[in-house]
Amino acid sequence: MSQSKEDKIRSILEAKNIKSNFQNKENLSEFNEKKASKRAEDLLDVYYNTLSTADMEFPYWYNREYRKSDGDIPVVRRAKALKAAFSHMTPNIIPGEKIVMQKTRHYRGSFPMPWVSESFFVAQGEQMREEAKKLASNTADELTKFGSGGGNVTESFGNVVSIAGKFGMRKEEVPVLVKMAKEWVGKSVEDLGFHYEKMMPDYDLKENLMSTLICMFDSGYTLPQGREVINYFYPLNYGLDGIIEMAKECKKAVAGNASGDGLIGMDRLYFYEAVIQVIEGLQTWILNYAKHAKYLESIETDLEAKKEYSDLVEILEHIAHKQPRTFREALQLTYTIHIASVNEDAISGMSIGRFGQILYPWYEQDIEKGLITKEEVIELLELYRIKITCIDCFASAGVNGGVLSGNTFNTLSIGGLKEDGSTGANELEELLLEASMRCRTPQPSLTMLYDEKLPEDFLMKAAECTKLGSGYPAWVNNSNGTTFMMKQFADEGMTVEEARAFALGGCLETSPGCWKQLTLNGKTYSIAGGAGQSAGSGVHFIANPKILELVLMNGKDHRMNIQVFEPHNKPLDTYEEVIEVFKDYYKQAINVLERANNIELDIWRKFDTSIINSLLKPDCLDKGQHIGNMGYRYNATLNVETCGTVTMVNSFAALKKLVYDDKAFTIEEMKDAILNNFGFKDALEVGNYSMADQVKVDKTGKYDAIYKACLDAPKYGNNDLYADNILKNYEVWLSKVCEEAQSLYAKKMYPCQISVSTHGPQGAATLATPDGRLSGTTYSDGSVSAYAGTDKNGVYALFESATIWDQAVVQNSQMNLKLHPTTIKGQQGTKKLLDLTRSYLRKGGFHIQYNVVDSETLKDAQKNPDNYRQLMVRVAGFTQYWCELGKPIQDEVIARTEYEGV
């Protein structure tokens, strides 16, 4: 925000006696020169004034061609449909843009994919049509109802229908969506998945787990791709024409030739044909933008703007065919390929990877030749940040709000090591940090792959960036990441050198990569890129406290009145018996969800085959096999995601202490207190989702003693082995149990321990818990963050608790800390923040991220969201605009312990 805008807003607020709290003024004042370029600020204003728009153009052309090519080989048929969709996308260039193209013809938005999932649109079809009919009488006043939600269209207005709680769609497009959705009934990945899932003998258990929110959502048709790292190598090294030529040559070599691979060898011919079809569609898409830029040039009267359009024409016409020549061309091509990738499927978390190292060849050579300055590079990176922030993912309201919080997790990793073990940091990565400090947008989020070999000044620069309060970079233990790579992918040939190529996919999913040798103007560079399947498509978010709830309630969900598990009918006379039943229920949940997910993903790979992401990542082009035929180098990537770990740990500690060790209460008394919410209203009734401001209704005091005892029971995060050992035992057990699960590729699975935003809705679906948490309130965030307000012994005690187990044996763990801005003010404060981070990572912690903001600012922003449009917070592995978060997550972030001294 410019100083003039800030002063104007402050004067307005002060006139109304409203406190003017801007994000982290204590720390921003240290870096008051960190302002985005005028061009970037103008485009950010466009973004802030743009609503998320759902558009039917891409699906219309996809569906039309798909029908037309009925009878063709499935992978080729899908390629032709994608080609038609890309070829017919309407170009839209915003004045001032130097990086162009987007998901749809709208600056911000996405589109539905009924071939993947259509049930929501069919079920809501009549309602949406009725909504569209009555909209003509709506007044413009209704616009203000969702103004506090940033770009989210939470309510219908004017000529616009709200869809999935986030997107607006023009009413004339609604009938097209409903008609198309009905065409896919019984044929979508979702419907076919349900059809075959029902053949499982324990299908009812799976449905019960979903209905009660023990499991958050199915991944096979909801978000089948993503939470992985893209690979830009082939377009960057060969150009799009080069890929087509490779595919044509390979087609000749494999036609009719099984080459000892059996029947799967015959699939290579069809895959290479599909690659050609899709690339041709992408080329048409790019060239359509070039034509549009040429048209804009022809009508532009300003000479400077005219030259900019001319430059765009030259860039787009070149990258549509050839290897990029300059840094700007390489940046444009990688962005274009990224959009192509996320348009192929329902995707969140298609992460960018080691971007500063990938684009370094062009940066180095352009700087040496004097073709570009550092300031020009920074501006381009600012513009890139805005374009990535514009990416939206179309999903159901439950997924968009309950998991993604509107974020798409396009994480960019910096630091780490090169193939030879030397530092991966370079000058371009420093400029990426600088651009992130000047142009503070939620996307792309940055992750520092911390290693002891990284230069001190580079780490200090990253700490300065974190201090500004954007929540990034998050800090990840590079040593832990490479150790996990070696463990999980040993059977697929992972080496130490290749393990160093990993990066973060999605918000916090450790994702395998590989090194490729790129040649630019005769000089060879080794660059990293993704080489694995989705690292987040598996069992999606088991609610740990909810499993414990059902143990106590004999397998029954009292909120929904559903008998989820078979009654165990055990008296739970001992703590060991509670643990035994918990493990049994947990294993049942993993088993049935894993098998259902395998069916969904198997149908997805057959009918919604990935072609763009397949051709990008090694070794699909070499093998002639797409993702679904394990063309990728690494395929043991599917996981079991969990939520609410610390709430569960604290609950076990309370049960053990109060019921079994001290015998202060019986198990029946505990169950009664839980069913009656310790005498309080449910959080959903109150409208507050943290433990603050809950309303007591019991006037007898019946539950006062047990409630106080539960709150006072041992809690994780205080270096107290009573609670911490419960976490340790759980983690050791969970890792083994997940390895027993098997993905559709017959590969072992592993734990993924992040909450994203699921701790909100899953907490809402859970009764009170034995730790004193009340019904409907949000779970603990992350996996090793303390439950809000329960870490009483300082941050270093929390670190001791978190590192009681070996965090390198699983995909991730998640630690969130909230620091008051004054705690890390000044240069010494920056050093203090870096030392704090080092302390945790050196102890074996995998991940740590910070919110540097005071709680009073957040409370005021909750009341006056329009005054804080630019305020961002770190949630759980991602950064998002405060005004676009749901209230349950806002309440949880406010409630987190705020450290004023470290």
Swiss-Prot record:
Record field: catalytic activity: 4-hydroxyphenylacetate + H(+) = 4-methylphenol + CO2; 3,4-dihydroxyphenylacetate + H(+) = 4-methylcatechol + CO2
Residues reported in the UniProt entry to bind 4-hydroxyphenylacetate: S348, C507, H540, E641
The record's account of how the chain is modified after translation: Requires the activating protein CsdA to generate the key active site glycyl radical that is involved in catalysis. Phosphorylated on serine. Phosphorylation may trigger the formation of the active heterooctamers and thereby regulates enzyme activity.
EC category: lyase
Domain Glycine radical: 782-902
Sequence positions bearing Glycine radical: G877
EC numbers on record: 4.1.1.83
Keyword terms, alphabetized: Lyase, Organic radical, Phosphoprotein
InterPro entries reported for this sequence: Gly_radical, GRE, PFL_dom
Active site: C507, E509
GO molecular function: 4-hydroxyphenylacetate decarboxylase activity
Disulfides per UniProt: none
Gene3D superfamilies, sorted: 3.20.70.20
Coiled coil: none
Recorded GO CC terms: cytosol
NCBIfam families: glycyl_HPDL_Lrg
Described purpose of this protein according to its UniProt entry: Glycyl radical subunit of the HPA decarboxylase that decarboxylates phenylacetates with a hydroxyl group in the p-position. Active toward 4-hydroxyphenylacetate and 3,4-dihydroxyphenylacetate, forming 4-methylphenol and 4-methylcatechol, respectively. Is likely involved in the catabolism of aromatic amino acids such as tyrosine fermentation. 4-methylphenol (p-cresol) formation provides metabolic toxicity, which allows an active suppression of other microbes and may provide growth advantages for the producers in highly competitive environments.
Family: Belongs to the glycyl radical enzyme (GRE) family. HPAD subfamily.
Name the UniProt record assigns to this protein: 4-hydroxyphenylacetate decarboxylase glycyl radical subunit
Source organism (scientific name): Clostridioides difficile (strain CD196) (Peptoclostridium difficile)
Gene name tied to this protein: hpdB
